[in-house]
Amino acid sequence: MDLLSGTYIFAVLLACVVFHSGAQEKNYTIREEMPENVLIGDLLKDLNLSLIPNKSLTTAMQFKLVYKTGDVPLIRIEEDTGEIFTTGARIDREKLCAGIPRDEHCFYEVEVAILPDEIFRLVKIRFLIEDINDNAPLFPATVINISIPENSAINSKYTLPAAVDPDVGINGVQNYELIKSQNIFGLDVIETPEGDKMPQLIVQKELDREEKDTYVMKVKVEDGGFPQRSSTAILQVSVTDTNDNHPVFKETEIEVSIPENAPVGTSVTQLHATDADIGENAKIHFSFSNLVSNIARRLFHLNATTGLITIKEPLDREETPNHKLLVLASDGGLMPARAMVLVNVTDVNDNVPSIDIRYIVNPVNDTVVLSENIPLNTKIALITVTDKDADHNGRVTCFTDHEIPFRLRPVFSNQFLLETAAYLDYESTKEYAIKLLAADAGKPPLNQSAMLFIKVKDENDNAPVFTQSFVTVSIPENNSPGIQLTKVSAMDADSGPNAKINYLLGPDAPPEFSLDCRTGMLTVVKKLDREKEDKYLFTILAKDNGVPPLTSNVTVFVSIIDQNDNSPVFTHNEYNFYVPENLPRHGTVGLITVTDPDYGDNSAVTLSILDENDDFTIDSQTGVIRPNISFDREKQESYTFYVKAEDGGRVSRSSSAKVTINVVDVNDNKPVFIVPPSNCSYELVLPSTNPGTVVFQVIAVDNDTGMNAEVRYSIVGGNTRDLFAIDQETGNITLMEKCDVTDLGLHRVLVKANDLGQPDSLFSVVIVNLFVNESVTNATLINELVRKSTEAPVTPNTEIADVSSPTSDYVKILVAAVAGTITVVVVIFITAVVRCRQAPHLKAAQKNKQNSEWATPNPENRQMIMMKKKKKKKKHSPKNLLLNFVTIEETKADDVDSDGNRVTLDLPIDLEEQTMGKYNWVTTPTTFKPDSPDLARHYKSASPQPAFQIQPETPLNSKHHIIQELPLDNTFVACDSISKCSSSSSDPYSVSDCGYPVTTFEVPVSVHTRPPMKEVVRSCTPMKESTTMEIWIHPQPQRKSEGKVAGKSQRRVTFHLPEGSQESSSDGGLGDHDAGSLTSTSHGLPLGYPQEEYFDRATPSNRTEGDGNSDPESTFIPGLKKAAEITVQPTVEEASDNCTQECLIYGHSDACWMPASLDHSSSSQAQASALCHSPPLSQASTQHHSPRVTQTIALCHSPPVTQTIALCHSPPPIQVSALHHSPPLVQATALHHSPPSAQASALCYSPPLAQAAAISHSSPLPQVIALHRSQAQSSVSLQQGWVQGADGLCSVDQGVQGSATSQFYTMSERLHPSDDSIKVIPLTTFTPRQQARPSRGDSPIMEEHPL
C-alpha cells in the first residue's frame, strides 16, 4: 500500500505542472496483462487543457502518439479526445522489466504530441506497471539432493536451495513446507539481507546411517498472491559418516570491482578456506551455490580447488552492472562453508549513442512530406538519443551536420524535437536529407548518426512574374483599328498546374484595347484621339492555375502621338474688359487666354491683333493687352477689335475672338445738391403737421456712375432736438415729433450727401432752413432771418470728418502750453493799449446801439471785405473769429509811396453774442438767398466791373510775410446791400444767382501761378502783439507787345490781426471744398460750424466758443466796436429825413442817403476790411487748411451787420490807423474807389465752386459787376453805370452776358498735389462794347486777359 500511495502522489504532482510549458510529464498506473481497449486516462482533462487561452487554430486540436518506427505500442490514444486505451499487445511486466532489479518499479514510457503548432505540447506519459500473480515459485531443480552426517545434532539446520518467483512483492515466494517428512526432519524459512526467503532443513531426531541412509520427501513452496500459486520438489537426504570439522572461509563477504572491458580469464578474486581435519576430510572443494544466477555462472568461472574466480565471458555493465556470487566450501562433509562475492562491473565507454526517431508527422516510405507553406516551428519528429554507458559516458548530445531550415530543440533528457526553423521553399530546395549526429561525453567520445529524409511539397505560393516591370508603347492618333502594340510575358516559379499562366486585361483597361489570354498580345481595337485622351495607363494581369490561383500585374503606358488636327480655342468667344479711365498708357488691360488641344509645336499659339489696330498691343505669348493710348470715357466709352490665335503646326490652324474694352468711370465727382438750390432757401412747416409727415426732400445728384453715383443722406448738424429725421436713400426729411410753442421759428438742418464711391467717398453738405410757423406774412423778413441764420454756426450732432487722434507727444503738449501762456500775456497787453486809445469812441458807439439789435448803414458805406483762406488740414478751429485791424493801401505804378491812396482803419469785430448763446451777427459772414426780390429792389446802386477768375491758392513767399495776388477762383461780387448777392458775403452753400446785364469790356488781370501747398510744421512760438496781413490785387502789367499802358495802380489791403486771433486756423464761413486741398480726413465745414469738433486745435489755448469767451482778447472787442459805431452814426442822422421804415430795418437806399462827394485822394474816406480767416495764414494755408475754405475780403456796413466795418463819409471822417507788424502777412488786392461811391468787395464761394465778385457804387448810376460761378458754368452780369477805379471812373453802357468754362479738379489732385501749378480753365472772353474814362487818364481799364 505504501508503494501505491507514493505512486499516486507522484502522479498528482506531475499533473500540477503548468500546461503551457514546452514539455510535460504525465504518469498513469496500469496492471500487467490488461485486456485490450481498457481506458487508462484522458489527457484533455488530466492535463487541464481547458486552461489554455482561446486561440484561433489552423486545425483542430490533435493528440498524436509518438513512437519508434517498427515498435508495437502497448497503448493507443484518441487523436481528437486525448483518451488513452490499451491495445491487443500483452503487457508482461516480467518481460518489460527483466533487467531491472526486483526492488525497482517497472515503467513503460511513451510520448504524445499535442497539435497544431499554435498549441504544440510534447507530453511524456509514464505507465507504472503493477505486478500480478501470474507466475508460480519454482525450485531450481525438481529433485534436491542433500547429505547430512549421521552424527548431526538435533535441531541442526541445513540450507536448501531456494525457489524463484518472477513476481515481486506479495506475489513472490512467501512460504516453504515439507511434505511427508516422517517427523525426522523439519523446515525453517529465514530471510536474507536482500529480502530473499531461504528454506533450512532441521534435524529433529538422531540419524543412524546403518539403520537408514536415505530419506525422500517433498518440499513445497508458496507465494502470497491471489490466487496463491505453489510448486514442489523432491528432497532426497543422504546420511553420511561423521565429519568432525567444517571448512571455514577466511572472508565471508568480498566485494570487488572490475571494468566491463576486462578480458576473459582475468582474475576477479580468490577465496581462501581452511579445514582442521586431515586427510581426505581436510580437502576443500569450492562451488557456486544453486542461488547464483545463470548469468553469473555464465560470466564467471570458479576454480573448485583453488577458489579462484575468473572471467569466463566478456562482461557487459549495461546488461548486468553487478553480480552476487554465493560460493560454498565443502570438505566432503554435510556442513559446507558459505562466502558471498559481490562483483561490481564498472562502466567503460564501450557503447555508442543510439538515435531513436519517433515521427510526429507520419512518414511515407520513411520520408516525411512537408508542404512548403507550413508555418515556422512545425514539429516533425521526436529524436531520442541514448547511451548505455553511465555518467559522462552516457551523456549524449544530438545535432545536425550542416545548416538546414530545421533545428533540434531539447525537451527532455536526451530527447529533442526536430522542427522547422525557416520557411520552406519548394522552388529553392525540393528535398532534404538530414543527418542527425549523437555523441557521448566519453573519452574518447563515441558518436552515432542517423538519416532523416524530408520531401517538400510544392504549393501555389508564387505568383506569375512579368519579364518587364513597366511596359511603354507609343502610337499616333487617328490609327487604324486592329494594330498590334506589344506582347507581354510572365513566368511562374511553381511547378505543374501552378505554373500555367493565363493573361487578361485589368479592370482599369479601356475598351480601346484587347489582349490574347494565351500569348499576351496587346491590340488596339478602336481609333484613338489624343485630344480626348493623350495617354492610357492600365494594367495587364497574369493568373496561374493553382488553388487558389495567384495573380500579378504589370502597368502598361500607351502614349498617343499628337497630330495637328485642332485649331486654337479661345476661352471665350468674346472678351469684355473694364478699365478705369485713369489707366496709364501701356498699363495692363486684361489677359487673353487661348488653348490648343494639340501638343508641342501644334499647340504653340501666337496671338496678334487683326486690322492693324495701333491703339492696343497684345503680347504674342502671354496674351496681355496693353493700351497705346490714354483713355477718356467722355470721348470714347469702349473699344472693339479682334485677336487672332495661330498654332505652330506644320500646317498651321488659327481662330479669332472679339475683344471689347469698356472704360469705367472713377469716383471724381461729389454729390451736388439740386434741392435746395442754396442755403438761403427755406421751407414752411406748420406747427399742426403730424409726426411722420415728410416736410421737405433734399435731392443731390452725382455725375459719376454706378456705386460712385449712389447718394446717401444724413443729418449732421442743426437738429439738436432730433425734431427731424431724414431717409438716407430718398432724402425725405420727416417730422418726428409734434411741434410745440418752443419749436416755433427757424430750424437750420445741416444735411450731408455722400456717395458710395471707392476708395474714398465724396460728400457735400447743405443747410435746409425749416421755418416752423402758421404762415409766412413777410417773405422779406423771413429771407433776412434766413440770411442772418446762415451767418451763425450750426450746432453739430454727428461727425462728418475724421478727428485726429487725441494722443500726442508730451513735448508738443508742453510747447503748446508755453505758447498759449505767452499768447495770453501778449493779448492782454495789446488789449489794454488799444482800449486806452479808443475809449472815447467806444463809449459813444455803445450809447447809439442800446435801442436796436442791428442796423443797416447807407449803401455808400456798405462795404465789406471778406476773405476765406483755404487750409489743407487744421486742428480744433474755434467757431469765433477775431479780426481787429484792416489797412487798405492803394499804390500806383508811378507813385508807390502815395499817402493819399493809403487809408488805415481800425476795425473792431465782436465774435460772440452776449445773449443766450447766440452768435453775434457782426462776427459771422452772412449769406442771403439769391432770390430776394424785395431787397434787390431796395438797393439798386451798383457799378459794373469786369468779371475775372483767380487762382484758388495763395503762394507762400516766406513764413511770416505773404504778398498774394488773388487767384482766379476767388472772384469779387459787388451787389446791392441786400440783393441776390449779399454785400457781406456770397452764399457759401448754394449756387449764386447774381446776374445782371453788363457792358462789354476787357479785363486785364494779373495771373500768378504758384506751386502746390506743402505741409509746413507750424511753429509753436508765440506771435507778436499783432500780425499784419496784406492781400494784394493788382492789374496785370501790359505786355511788351501791347505797349499801351505804362503803369497800373495797385491796391494793398493790410490786415492787422492780434495774437489772440491766431487761435483759429479756419475761416468763419461755409466755404466750398477747395479742389486743391481736399483730403479724405479733413473737410471744410459750413458757416459758423464748430470746427473744434473735427480738427485739432492749432493754438495753445483750449478754449472754445462754448466757453462763453473763446478769444482771450474778447475784452478788447467792445472798445473797437464802439469806435466803429461812432463813425457811422453821423451819417445815419444826416440822412434820416429821407429814410423809410424799411430803410431802418434793411438799410438805406439811394433815395435817402446822398452824402457829399469826397475827393478821390481825401483821407476822410473810411475803408473797412473784414478778414474771416484766423492768422497766421501763411501757416494755416499749408498746415491747417480745411477743404474749400473761401477767402473773402469785404467792405461792409456798420454794425450790427455781420462782420462789417462802417465807412463814414460825412465829416469829420474817422480814420483809424492800423498797427503794422512784421510778417506773416496775408496780402490781397481789392478794387478801391474813392467816395462818394460805396465800395464793396465780396467773394461768394458756395459749393460747388460758386464764386462771385461785386463792386457796388452809389452815384451817378448803380453799377454792378458780378461773377457767378456754379458747378459747370459761370455768368457775368454788368449794369450800365460808372465804374470808379483807383485813378478814375469808367463808363459802361450796356451789359453782355457770357458763359465761362467750368473748372474741375480731380480727387487725386486734391489728395496728392503735384509739383505743377494748378491748371485753370480760362473764362470766356468778353469784348468791351463801350468804354469811358470820366476823369483820370491813368485809371486802369479791365481788359480781356488770355490765360
Curated annotation (Swiss-Prot):
**Residue spans, topological domain Cytoplasmic:** 834-1347
Q: How does it sit in the membrane?
A: Single-pass type I membrane protein
Instruction: Give the GO biological process terms.
Output: cell adhesion; homophilic cell adhesion via plasma membrane adhesion molecules
Instruction: Supply the Pfam families for this chain.
Output: Cadherin, Cadherin_2, Protocadherin
Q: Where is the signal peptide?
A: 1-23
Domain Cadherin positions = 26-139, 140-249, 250-355, 362-466, 467-570, 571-673, 677-795
Annotated protein name in UniProt:
Protocadherin-11 X-linked
Tell me which species this is from: Homo sapiens
Q: What lineage does the source organism belong to?
A: Eukaryota, Metazoa, Chordata, Craniata, Vertebrata
